UniProtKB/Swiss-Prot annotation:
Pathway: Amino-acid biosynthesis; L-histidine biosynthesis; L-histidine from 5-phospho-alpha-D-ribose 1-diphosphate: step 1/9
Main location: cytoplasm
Catalytic activity: 1-(5-phospho-beta-D-ribosyl)-ATP + diphosphate = 5-phospho-alpha-D-ribose 1-diphosphate + ATP
UniProt subcellular location: Cytoplasm
Function field: Catalyzes the condensation of ATP and 5-phosphoribose 1-diphosphate to form N'-(5'-phosphoribosyl)-ATP (PR-ATP). Has a crucial role in the pathway because the rate of histidine biosynthesis seems to be controlled primarily by regulation of HisG enzymatic activity.
Family assignment from sequence similarity: Belongs to the ATP phosphoribosyltransferase family. Short subfamily.
InterPro entries (alphabetical): ATP_PRibTrfase_cat, ATP_PRibTrfase_CS, ATP_PRibTrfase_HisG, ATP_PRibTrfase_HisG_short
GO molecular function: ATP binding; ATP phosphoribosyltransferase activity
Protein's UniProt name: ATP phosphoribosyltransferase
Organism superkingdom: Bacteria
Enzyme class of the recorded protein, top EC level: transferase
UniProt comment concerning the protein's domains: Lacks the C-terminal regulatory region which is replaced by HisZ.
GO CC annotation terms, alphabetical: cytoplasm
Amino acid sequence: MTKPLVFAIPKGRILKEALPMLEAAGIIPEPAFLDKESRLLRFKTNRPDIEIIRVRAFDVATFVAHGAAQMGIVGSDVIEEFSYPELYAPVDLDIGHCRLSIAEPKRLAKDDDPREWSHVRVATKYPHLTHRHFEARGVQAECIKLNGAMEIAPALGLAGRIVDLVSSGRTLEENGLVEVEKIMPISARLIVNRAAFKMRAGDIAPLVENFRRLVGVADNVA
């Protein structure tokens, strides 16, 4: 008997927007998935051939890349940070929109010109993506990896600048920071394990097409 497909969903900002899309694609999680008090991480769906796991966004990419999950939804920031060759991202889901940006204290930004940077010390959850961005600009970057609370790093002298996701900019403003450069726009993507796609194309390709139709992409699955 073929094992159910495992579909990885991220906790946090994307989850709320992803749920209606999942349901529209014909995948409805069991009621326990919506229970905020539940500590379960693995859930059944209305389809016996599909299960859902709910994990941290960065872990979605890892589970899918290593084949523990065959499909998932995750932000393009995570895809770019890890650059797993095992991941195929066939559909931009047009949800979870924000941007990855560089921010610094307002007092510094008054007289600062990013075009003149030669060396920066940055606190970020995205060290690889950040290094690549600055390397392309010819700027030497010292990246300090944090998993959260980036906004407080400049005030405590840990780093002069931060690289983080920005939506409304309110969190930056409340912490005395200002956005000075946008690195890239971010949106959520459907991801698939490449090996699983080849081995279980009959199961996975129709799901990919369902998501394509939902966002109005008419191209056939490559």
